[in-house]
């Protein structure tokens, strides 16, 4: 199995653009497979940004302790001061409910909460226009869906798009796969003609490389810096990436993530 570690660099550029929830991409390239997260953490966003294709893992069991329906907001000037932004969720099939079938318990109330809390936390940022663009695009989704996965998916795509990402987004529920955990991930990569699989630190703990090796698909290990003085990375595993966007804006944040992605690709494709 091919293993590459990705670290952060600081000297790259990337363009920003207005949020757009529709994406199309060409076959091949690097894929990341991850559950939909509400306003994801920077560590998650960085992994998805580094991939050319995000396969949304929407047909696994919903977990209330995970991030599908909640995000941890950090105060603009004091990231240690945090608050959960949570979407009350109804599980029609109890604990066995899949992420794709989880529903908003009160869509109107959730929409108001999202709007008020994000404005409260980041409305004073000089980069508020960029944050507001992300927020407005997500608020619009409450008018079209009551599915938690739909809101979480939209929040992630909108953040990625604000940073200039223009990859492909697919749902795992539309792709037939085998039952085994690693077999399933490998089948998703094969079915989408992906040439490499980008695996985060969480997935690496259980991943069996054999199903990927059988198809000649290298696995790239992705992680963000741990021993660093940069507050953006020190807080990247715990709080929503909205804080980073509010701190440095879309252009600088995109450049930072692009540098990390480029270093990964240079190491992984040699």
Model-derived features: positions:
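Residues lining hydrophobic/aromatic ligand-binding pockets adjacent to catalytic sites
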Residues: 2-270
């Amino acid at each position: 199995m091919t293993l590459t570690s990705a670290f952060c660099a600081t000297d790259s550029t990337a363009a920003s653009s207005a949020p757009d929830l529709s994406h199309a991409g060409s076959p091949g390239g690097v894929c990341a497979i991850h559950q939909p997260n509400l306003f994801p953490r920077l560590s998650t966003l960085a992994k998805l940004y580094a991939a050319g294709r995000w396969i949304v893992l929407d047909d696994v069991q919903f977990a209330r302790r995970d991030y599908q329906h909640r995000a941890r907001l950090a105060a603009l000037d004091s990231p240690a001061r945090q608050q959960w932004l949570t979407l009350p969720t109804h599980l029609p099939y109890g604990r066995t409910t899949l992420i794709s079938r989880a529903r908003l318990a009160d869509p109107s109330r959730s929409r108001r909460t999202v709007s008020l809390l994000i404005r409260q936390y980041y409305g004073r940022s000089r980069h508020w226009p960029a944050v507001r663009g992300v927020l407005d695009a997500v608020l619009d989704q409450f008018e079209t869906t009551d599915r938690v996965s739909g809101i979480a998916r939209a929040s992630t795509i909108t953040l990625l798009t604000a940073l200039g990402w223009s990859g492909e987004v697919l749902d795992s529920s539309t792709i037939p796969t085998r039952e085994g955990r690693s077999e399933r991930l490998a089948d998703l990569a094969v079915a989408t003609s992906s040439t490499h699989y980008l695996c985060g630190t969480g997935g690496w703990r259980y991943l069996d490389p054999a199903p990927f090796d059988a198809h000649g698909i290298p696995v790239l290990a992705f992680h963000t810096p741990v021993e660093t003085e940069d507050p953006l990375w020190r807080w990247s595993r715990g709080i929503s990436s909205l804080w980073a966007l509010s701190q440095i804006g879309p252009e600088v944040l995109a450049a930072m993530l692009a540098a990390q992605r480029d270093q990964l690709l240079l190491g992984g494709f040699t």
